[in-house]
């Protein structure tokens, strides 16, 4: 996909049957950002019309084999690798996910599964978990999704609540 900088994307994950919040986020951002991603465990059918215009992968709770296990999306010169994470054993190690991201030469690797919002860098790649939009785990009991803004110099990760309020404590910036 041809995109000029800055590039902005929306990332959500682990909605676990809550179709309405996926629709809400899609309506709010479609046409205003360069891409929308869902990192799996929607528990919706892969043929659901909500997925039109959304990059979506299969999670461990998605029994519909119509979803891909992983995607690689190129927006301008930015390579985004996307997966749920369970097949890479992320509960135990980052090694397999990291190896795949390196093989794809990914600038950003999106994952879900853990229901914990996180953004961190290893080597070239910035790893982003948007948290769960429905069932958060870990110390932050907030249902979240992420907005990522990429420009020449930086990758900025912002987290938002279901009410689309910025959860500023989690904002991070990474050098490109």
Predicted regions span which residues?
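Short, small-residue-biased leader/transition segments that mark boundaries at the very start
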Residues: 1-5
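Core catalytic region of metal-dependent phosphoesterases/phosphodiesterases
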Residues: 7-76
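Active-site-proximal beta-strand elements of phosphoester/diester hydrolases
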Residues: 8-16, 79-86, 126-131
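Active-site environment of divalent metal-dependent phosphoester hydrolases
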Residues: 16-21, 42-47, 61-66, 88-93, ...
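A short, polar/proline- and glycine-enriched secondary-structure boundary/capping micro-motif
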Residues: 21-23, 91-95, 139, 165-173
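Conserved beta-sheet core of the metallophosphoesterase superfamily
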Residues: 55, 91-154
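Helix-adjacent hinge/juxtasegments
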Residues: 57-60, 66-107
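Charged phosphate-binding loop/patch that engages nucleotide di/tri-phosphates or the phosphate backbone
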Residues: 151-176
């Amino acid at each position: 996909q041809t995109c000029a900088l800055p590039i902005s994307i929306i990332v959500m994950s682990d909605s676990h049957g809550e179709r309405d919040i996926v629709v809400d986020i899609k309506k709010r951002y479609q046409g205003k950002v360069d891409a929308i991603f869902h990192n799996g465990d929607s528990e919706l059918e892969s043929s659901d019309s909500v997925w039109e215009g959304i990059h979506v992968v299969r999670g461990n709770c998605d029994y519909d084999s119509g979803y891909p296990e992983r995607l690689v999306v190129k927006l301008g010169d930015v390579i985004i690798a996307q997966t749920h994470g369970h097949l890479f054993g992320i509960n135990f190690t980052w090694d397999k996910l990291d190896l795949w991201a390196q093989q794809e030469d990914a600038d950003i690797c999106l994952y879900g599964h853990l229901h914990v919002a996180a953004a961190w860098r290893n080597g070239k790649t910035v790893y982003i978990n948007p948290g769960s939009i429905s069932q958060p785990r870990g110390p932050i009991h907030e249902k979240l999704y992420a907005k990522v803004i990429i420009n020449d110099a930086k990758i900025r990760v912002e987290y938002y609540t279901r009410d689309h309020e910025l959860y500023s404590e989690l904002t991070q910036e990474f050098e490109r």
